[in-house]
Amino acid sequence: MPFFNRLASSAALALVLLVAAGCDPQRISELEEGLSTEVDVRDRFGPPDQVWDEGNGSRTLEYNRQPAGQRNYMITIGPDGKMSALRQVLTPENFARIQAGMGMDEVRRRLGKPAKVTPYALSGETHYDWRFLEPPNTAMLFTVVTDRSLRVLRTQTTPDMASPDHNGPR
């Protein structure tokens, strides 16, 4: 019976995450840059996973859809309290900006929280994975590899073999 309970709980969680991810386009369509306020954003998306102060009076609200989702949103609220930008940050263009030597704090701020973090004690490396969709609709993983000082060594992009959409051997 404990196995069945775990299975049922996992299925329920997966359904909730799937439904929540499916609501994002509706939530986004209800917001308008320059008019929507932080209250409007929080009413539609809930509390952010992280709030980043921008130094100019603006703040960026992080809405993370990892580990099950394939998008992360950064929504900027200007000093006037109005939304000035809404970006889905898990894109090939943003991945190309992640360079060797960059600190993990900067990577985290650009991409949001990763889906998975895997430390490798013997090599001293840590792998940070983000799930994303490569246009038009291919499930992929973007991996940032850091050293012990949390500096980027390299990045790589591979098919997301754990995705339910993957049709090859696992």
Question: What annotation goes with each model-predicted range?
Answer:
Residues M1-A21:
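Sec-dependent bacterial lipoprotein signal peptides
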Residues C23-R170:
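Residues within mature, well-folded domains
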